[in-house]
Every structure is written in C-alpha cells, then in structure tokens.
Amino acid sequence: MLNSNWINYAKPFAMLLLMVGLRITAVNAQTGNSFAYNDTAFLLNGKPFQMISGEIHYPRVPKEAWRHRMKMAKAMGINTIGTYVFWNVHEPQKGKYDFSGNNDIAAFVKIAQEEGLWVVLRPSPYVCAEWEFGGYPYWLQNEKGLQVRSRETKYIQAYRQYIMQIGKQLATLQIHKGGNIILVQVENEYGSYSNDKEYLELNRKMFVEAGFDGTLYTCDPAKDVDKGHLPGLFPAVNGLDKPSQMKSLVRKYNNGKGPFFIAEWYPAWFDWWGEKHHTVPAENYSGKLDTVLAAGISINMYMFHGGTTRGFMNGANYYDSSGYEPQISSYDYDAPLDEAGNATPKFWQFRNAISKNLPAGTVLPDVPSAKKVISIPAITLKKQVSIFDVLPKSKSSSNPLTFEALNQAYGYVLYRTTLNGGKAGILKIKELRDYGIVMINGKRVGILDRRLRQDSLFLKLPAGKITIDILVENLGRVNFGPHLLKNLKGITQSVLFNGNELKGWQMFSLPFEKLDGINFTATAKKSDAPVLKHGEFTLEETGDTYLDMSKWGKGCVWINGHNLGRYWEIGPQQTIYVPAEWLKKGKNELIVFELIHTDKTLLDAVTQPELNKLRK
C-alpha cells in the first residue's frame, strides 16, 4: 500500500557535521557527488535540492519497459524515482534468492542513473503496497513463534540474512559510492502498526551493517509520526499536503528544523474486487501539487505509475467491520501514467504545475510519443484440459493442510476426501482462505467466498461412496493491519458435514508457477470442473492490447509464459493489460484458467481498458 520511512545515519561523524552546519553528508570521492541536508533544505552537491519523486515498482512493469517509464517521468519533471524492494520476490523460498529478469533491482536503479534520475530506495522490509503479505515471503509463517515487525529472534535472523543480500545488490549504488541512491527508507509506516523504538533501532543497525551507510529516513502518516519515528533520524510524513501543517509536524519531531519531505503524496487510490474503481479528477490535485512545491517541500508521488500486480502477488485488506478485501490485478491507481504507461490528464496538469516551480530557464524533455496499441481478432481457445487431469502427486493427512504446510506460496490447492452418501446436510469449512469451489464426484455443487463471509453449503449427497473435492484459491494475503499475523492460506482449520469433522484428506498442490508439460487436447466437451484453456494467435506487429474478460467468470491468464494476473466477472476490472514487450511477431500462446464458465472458448481483445464495471 503506502508507506515510507526517512532515516539519517551519521553517528561516527555527528559532531563534525554539526560543526559545518550539516547533519548528514554523503560524498562520492570519485565524482564529487554528494547528498546532504541542513536545517532548511536538502543539498545535492552542496546546493539546495527539491526532490520531485515518482514511485514506480519494478515487479509491476516489464523490465523491457523500465526505461520508457523513466523517460516519461523525466518528461513530467520528475527528478527522482522511488521504489520498494520486495522480500517475497527476492527470497521466494528460504535461502533461495532471485535477482534475475524482472527482479533485477540493481538494473532498475542503474537504468534510472543512465536516465539522469536519483533513487529513493525503500527496502523496509515490510512494504504494504497492496502486495501479497506486505512483501513478506510466505515461508516466514512456517517458523514457529516468528512474529514479523518485532524483535523476535527468528524474524530478526531471517530479516538480517535478507537485508544483507539486498546490500550486496544495492549498497554500492548509493550516491557516495558513485551511484544514484540518495535516500534509503528503514521500515515502513511503522507507527501505524506499533511503537517499539528498540525494534526501529535494530532496523537502522542492520541497514548500516548491510552497507546502507548514507542518508536513512523513516516515514509515517501524520497521526502516527510519534510512534513510528526513531529519534535522530529524519521524519518524513505521508499524505499530508498542507504546507504549514506538514512543516509544523516535521519540526516537532526534528528539533524544530527541516527539511520537509512528503514521502507518499497520493494522486488517487487503489482498487479491490467488488468495489468501484477509484479516480480523482486531475484538477483536484494539480493545485495542491503547485502549493506544496511552491512551499519548497519535496515529495514522492505514490504512484507516478502503478502498472500491474501480475501473477498471484496482489495483497488484501482485512478489517473487522468490512471483512476481507482482496485487491485487483490492475494497479492503475488513477496515476499520471495509466496501467500501460500512457500519459493521463494528470500527467499533463502535473507537468504544468512542476514546470512553474522549476528554476528559471529550465526546459523539460519532450514527452515520448504515444505507445502503439493494436487490435487483435477474437481468439479461439480450441484446446483444454480439466483440473483433474493435471493433478500432481498428492500429500495425505488426517486433517486438511494449509498452503504453508505444503510449502506452497500462491495459486490453488485441491482438497479431497471421501464419505458415504445418500444423505443431505450442511458442509462447513472453518476458516476458508479464501475462495473454494466444492465438487461432488467431479461436478461443481457450490462456491464459498471469504469476501462474503461464506463458510457453509447445503449438500444433497447421492447414494454410495462419494468423493468431495474442494479447490481453494489463495486470493492474496493481507498486507496491512493487525491481521498481518493471521495469513495462513487454504483450509486453515477443519471441514464438517452435519457437525461431524471429515478426516482422511489428500492435498494436490497447484501453484501454477510454470505450465510446461501440460497436454491440452482439442475438445468441445463441457467440463463440470475448472479447466485450463489453450489457444494461439498470430501477429504481424506488436503493440499494447487488452483482453476482454467480461464474458468469462473467474481465473487467470498467461501470454507466452507470462502470468498476466487475475480476472473476475464481479469487477471493477474487466480487462487484462497485455504489454507489447511480452508479445512477438508470429505465433503467440494464450492459456486461460477458468473456474466458473468452463464452456467459454472465444476471447476478444480490445484497445481500451475497462476498470470500472461492477457486476454484483
């Protein structure tokens, strides 16, 4: 979601810095570049510097498109890129690290430097960000007694090992070492969660141990700065865009001094399934942006470009009042750049506001030309395979096992048991996480949805021995709030029929990390169970496009091996963005996993997104 933290570390040299009027200085001996701040301003190479930062998350944008998005940022007047670093992306399994391809965070930072942009790095390790488990890897929950965002020993040990790996990738890219990282954030809106200053100090020490010895900071919403700020570190503030109030708050926690940084300035908001798409007119914010910049306040725009939360990496909110709210795959955010990287009205109005506040004579770069959008004829998915025909070897247990117990992070698990039929009653799944399709002898008989607080289903069982299958989907672990510590997935307790607990379960893991080796067959036969559909289409040219999923039910889509994300007929998102970078001239492969409307075979492509169509 939205979190950022400003921290400054200069203990060994504190007295010296104070003598020269600076509280933190990072100098690169080779190039002479330095970043610092005094009582009123940030200083870049000794001169006042106003950060105009835009947030872009590298996993949400194809690697091939990173440079384009940065060129767009610079053309709007952005001089800095902010990004979280996502633990579950880089350590998907304990001790196994991945910095390749779209996870190459060092390449992302270096491209920003090549484009003349500074970087605000936010390794936290908690990111919120509408991201699965707030960025934490699922396997942390398998460590007995581990408690995230605390001084608990197992958590700190895992966290330290991870942040050391991040340091190996990025510490040398700080400004005083020849790079372009000017700020590094420690933790993330911690005041919204707790107030343990010793834990925050542990964070600071680990960052320094990992090589992040430049300018560190913390960030919190205005109401939580007292709890989330670590004395001695710079307090940035999220969401407060009234200059007098913002400056007063920073001075309160920074010994009466500046400078001033809105670490998350929100041009709109995110979306979740079953609720309308959030938009805010550009004119509602362009004036606010002008006011903030005119007051000399630095900002990080959350988001400048949201992109797409692909695969199964969306998070969820959970509140006792509203319940479970999984977020959609589009992270459009009604940002200055839309999901595909195109300029929106906000882009142009924000560009004007920024231009007014730049030094006299400054000329912004030309805006890159509009991206090509292509129309694809309707695609027929001629082949399919039932979920029952792709089941792997099962794991048996008396009681249902969670995803975590199966060492599975995301996707689906099929739970199977048998019982004697010839009776009717209530099937109850205690603590279903999150969406379950119930099948009797291979035929769907009902759906249970955690969003709707559904856990029970009336069943009339046929005579004889029957098989009950329950396909459970992880719709995204909670990424914000106290329920962060209650994030197991699957059937997390028990299954009852007429009050009697069902035993003797088989679990089939379906993480769908790769779809290699699946044998699709050409058939018109309707499946009573969820199906994987396969089709091909040929292109003479590539460009961005959108798949119209409004006639389908629920599932996810792969193009040429890339998991593009989820779709769900309830909306508001009805289209899936297909980036040009993942299409190719000639033959392209399309796979759809459809849970509900298994008879569908035709898929349309459109040239415009549909992100605001609800279907209750």
Protein language model regions, located:
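An active-site-proximal structural segment forming one wall of the substrate-binding cleft
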Residues: 104-121, 144-181
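N-terminal carbohydrate-binding accessory modules
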Residues: 28-80, 110, 542
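The substrate-binding groove and active-site-proximal loops of carbohydrate-active enzymes
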Residues: 51-62, 87-104, 141-161, 185-196, ...
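Active-site neighborhood of glycoside hydrolase catalytic domains
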Residues: 155-230
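Aromatic- and acidic-residue-enriched segments that line the glycan-binding/catalytic groove
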Residues: 94-103, 114, 124-150, 200, ...
